Each structure stands twice: as C-alpha cells, then as structure tokens.
Amino acid sequence: MNVMSKHALRFIVLSGSLAVTGAHADGDSARGKKLFEECAACHALERGANGVGPSLNGVFERKAGELADFRYSPAMKRSALPWNARTLDIFLADPQQEIKGNRMPFSGIPEARDRADLIEYLKAATK
C-alpha cells in the first residue's frame, strides 16, 4: 500500500468513527425515557421526591452529594463532581469505578448510545 493510500484509508476510518460518535452525541430522548424506567426504581424526577436514590430534579445544576435532603455516602459527598453531560456519561458507564465507595447499587451502562439517550432525556426531564 502506498503512502497516499494509507492516508486515504486513515481518513475514511477516522471520518466513519467521528460520524458514529456524532450520531450518539445528542442522544434520542424518547429512547432515553424508556431506559429511565430502570432508574425510576430508585430515582424520581420531581423536586424533593427522594427514594433509595436522590431526586434527579435539577441534577444538571448541582454537584454530586449536594442535595440537602438526601443522605449521600461520604465518597459521593467528597467527590463534589459537577453534573453535566460529560461527567454523567463517565459516571453512568461505571459508577463504582468513577466514584469508589459510592452506595449506588448499579453496575453501569456499558453502551455509549444508551448513555447518550438517557442523558438527553434527563436534560429535559430534570429541569
């Protein structure tokens, strides 16, 4: 393979991977709503409606462990992780790895598309 062909092949591969990433970057809110059904076992979207997990109302406007009327693990409080699309994506991929010692009994969402869809739903549903 000549040098020009190698560069062309790299460009095609990179372009394809960027296109796939871009397709999931915004997420599908309707699909995210369906995915949230599993989260709803512990989390509510309404303000002050804490369950086993904290209410997610206003989650994009606060830091981890900051909701006054919920008892967080010391690890979650110490993290003070600012919640945004990027940090939620990382956390939801593997909660125990991202904040070691947190009490959330959930192994994570391995698929990037699923996380993007859930986050897109949460952006609108938690305002």
Report residues per predicted region:
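Hydrophobic alpha-helical targeting segments used for export or membrane insertion
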Residues: 13-19
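Periplasmic/extracellular electron-transfer cofactor-ligation site
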Residues: 27-71, 77-82, 90-100, 124-127
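Sec/Tat signal peptide C-region and signal peptidase I cleavage site
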Residues: 21-25
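Conserved interaction-surface patches within small, structured recognition/assembly domains
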Residues: 101-106
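Bacterial N-terminal signal peptides that target proteins for export
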Residues: 2-12
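Alpha-helix N-capping/helix-start residues
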Residues: 29, 85, 111-112
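Short, exposed beta-strand-loop hairpins at the edges of beta-sheets
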Residues: 107-125
